[in-house]
Amino acid sequence: MEQTRIQMFEQQIYPEIFAEVAGNVMDRFGKQKKEIIEEWETILQQYMDQLADLQEEEEAPSIQEIDFSFLYTSLEDKHAKFQIDSYGEGGRVSGESILTEYISADWIADGAKVLAERLAERAEQENLRGYVRAAEIDKLRLRAVRSLLLCLAVRFKYIIRDMIDFRSLARVQKEPCFLIQIGEYMDWMKTIYAVQPAVDIFNCEQDTDLRFRSFHAIHYNEKQFKAFNLSQSDFRDCVFTESSITDCLMNDCMFDGCVFERLCIESTMMKGCIFANCVFQETIMKEIVLSESDKESSILDYFAPAEFHNCEFREVRLENCNADNCIVKNCDASKLGLENSSIVGSGFEERKDKEGQDELF
């Protein structure tokens, strides 16, 4: 009987309370984002400069990995915090941290505290206090902290570049594969920034990790991109002609100054992508996901809507695409057609309202 009551509390009541608290924590994170970025930027700049100084004095090797690790033990301290560590070749599994620093994470601790209080209140209301004791609530509090960290990790990827002083980072000697990660101390880590060696998509080993790559001034002519995971890669001044992109993962990619001509992009995930100064010519997008729908969105797996800035659309069609809430600024097109595509809350919708038709601009 006791175990059944506890399971009911964990499976029905905890998720409800966690969703509410997590939403509040994410709202607070969003409202305080500027202050959080400034705090992290200051500490990370000092940290990078210290690393570079150690390297100049030949007291530190080149760096492969910098980790932001949440310390569960700090939940009992006055201020919860992340520990910043850096590691040489092989990362954290191959050696000790070269330099350690700390940065506050009070918003996580505050959220965990509120959650524990609400769980205790709800247990009292449901006459379950005799079953859901302090130890059980503390276990759920720690579970919530892990989930909150996952929530934050998928959002940090969008602000980490604002936190980094790239001049300080440039001083640091880095391994060819360099990562910045966030997660739990001595546990899981999620990569939020990376510098990877150059790679040829169509001339590399089959198991090559194509994420976080940079592709500059490459002409892809009559190429078939099939089932590639190119998420968070950077395409600059690339040209795609007479080619196809099918069943690919391209979430959070950056396309700057790229040309897409006589191209078919189909069944591909492009959530969080930024298209800047791009030209789309005689291109069809079929069943492309540019943003998450309300049904698909998850607080634990967050993607920003795609953005289009200073782009040109010429003889382009979006068929059965999801482009809700996509940002469209300073874009010019001779013809952009929409067929069974969702554009609620996006810049495409605003322009459609002005024109009053599916063929925009």
What are these regions (language model features)?
Residues 1-23:
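N-terminal alpha-helical "arm" segments
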Residues 16-63:
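Short N-terminal edge-element motif at the start of the domain
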Residues 48-88, 173-196:
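Amphipathic, interaction-prone secondary-structure segments
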Residues 74-129:
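Intrinsically disordered, low-complexity regulatory segments enriched in Ser/Thr/Pro
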Residues 86-99, 141, 225-237, 300:
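Short, flexible N-terminal segments of the mature chain
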Residues 118-152:
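Compositionally biased, intrinsically disordered linkers/stalks adjacent to structured regions
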Residues 139-218, 222-223, 228:
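Elongated scaffolding segments in large macromolecular assemblies
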